[in-house]
A protein has these predicted regions:
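Conserved hydrophobic/aromatic beta-strand scaffold that supports enzyme active sites
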Residues: 104-106, 169-171, 181
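Flexible gly/pro-rich beta->alpha loop and the following alpha-helix that scaffold active-site loops
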Residues: 3-7, 11-78, 90, 206
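Acyltransferase
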Residues: 189-215
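Phosphate-binding/catalytic loops
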Residues: 118-122, 176-177, 181-192
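Catalytic beta-strand/loop cores that center a nucleophilic Ser/Cys/Thr
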Residues: 115-176
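Cysteine-nucleophile active-site neighborhood
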Residues: 45-122, 198
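Proline-centered loop/turn at the N-terminus of a beta-strand
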Residues: 75-77, 93, 139, 156, ...
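Histidine-centered divalent metal-coordination motifs
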Residues: 80, 144, 185
Length: 215
């Protein structure tokens, strides 16, 4: 059984994430972000999930050192604050984009995102009644006030949404496919396809890791 270690950045959504992973058939172990990097690695995770949480990613305990230790070696999935940490680790600028909390918005898939297996069949602006139309809009739950407007080197944007800062990245992956991040909350009821997205993210990351020969 796939073992996911979830780093808890002290957010109220953490156990919703745990429930979603367990319901999808994954084993999940939770560590607070106050433990050591060594503690996380000693659990022998198949994948590490960096949870949502308050504040800036640089202030979130071990998160940044953990990313430095495992990037490209252990599959990483960042959610909200965890995604911002991945962006920051690649020298992306994480900055205020206007607070939006508890709102479902349609993010717009990029050209790469349209082709990405995580979002296949989830768009709301395409379907059998619209032949030939390429869908790009996927409804997701926003609970954040920080964002990144420009995708940093080493990462590829999969989706964006409009904010006070302009378009910010809502989903991205590293160019080696070993890390992926979602700015939105897939575990929220306001992300209708969220549980499916989570499962697909895990499966995609593990597949990529097997191709890279890290597992």
């Amino acid at each position: 059984m796939t073992h996911i270690v979830l780093v808890d950045n002290q957010d109220s959504f953490v156990y919703n994430l745990v429930d979603a992973f367990v319901e999808a058939g994954f084993r999940c172990t939770v560590f607070r972000n106050t433990v050591s990097v060594e503690d996380v690695l000693a659990a022998e995770p198949d994948l590490i999930c960096l949870s949502p949480g308050p504040g800036h990613p640089r202030d979130a305990g071990i998160m940044m050192p953990l990313i430095s230790a495992v990037l490209g070696k252990v599959p990483l999935l960042g959610i909200c604050l965890g995604f911002q940490a991945l962006l920051d680790a690649h020298e992306g600028t994480v900055e205020p984009c206007g607070p939006v909390h508890g709102v479902s918005v349609p993010m717009r898939l990029t050209d790469v995102g349209v082709q990405h297996p995580v979002f296949a069949g989830m768009t709301i602006d395409a379907g059998p009644d619209l032949p030939g139309v390429i869908g790009r809009l996927v409804p997701v739950a926003r609970y954040h006030s920080l964002g990144c407007a420009s995708i940093p080197p080493g990462m590829v944007s999969l989706a964006t949404t409009k904010t006070d800062l302009g378009d910010v990245v809502m989903a991205a992956e590293t160019t080696d496919g070993m890390a992926m991040g979602l700015q939105f909350h897939p575990e929220s009821i306001l992300s209708p396809q969220g549980p499916i997205m989570l499962s697909r993210c895990v499966e995609q990351l593990l597949d990529n890791a097997n191709k890279e020969g890290t597992h």
